[in-house]
From Swiss-Prot:
Glycans are attached at residue 76. The gene is CLE5. The modification Hydroxyproline is found at residues 73, 76. This is CLAVATA3/ESR (CLE)-related protein 5. The lineage of its organism: Eukaryota, Viridiplantae, Streptophyta, Embryophyta, Tracheophyta. Residues 1-26 form the signal peptide. Keywords: Developmental protein, Differentiation, Glycoprotein, Hydroxylation, Secreted, Signal. Belongs to the CLV3/ESR signal peptide family.
């Protein structure tokens, strides 16, 4: 009797979890060619995923905090192998 109840419970749980995965909401990225090419800008990607860039706090200000003229380091440290 206990094994029958256990089997029924497991079947019900399996049905509940499978129904939950069927109702999951995932976004489909329509611009798959641009992503596969590797030349997609992050802002374009966020827009394609449905995010409103104007609602991000300070997304334009952060761009000006980073200097665009980066200098490469002087080479490997002679103290390390």
């Amino acid at each position: 009797m206990a094994t029958l109840i256990l089997k029924q419970t497991l079947i019900i749980l399996l049905i509940i979890f499978s129904l939950q995965t069927l109702s999951s909401q995932a976004r489909i990225l329509r611009s798959y060619r641009a992503v596969s090419m590797g030349n997609m800008d992050s802002q374009v990607l966020l827009h394609e995923l449905g995010f409103d860039l104007s609602k991000f706090k300070g997304h334009n200000e952060r761009r000006f905090l980073v200097s665009s003229d980066r200098v490469s380091p002087g080479g490997p440290d002679p103290q390390h192998h």
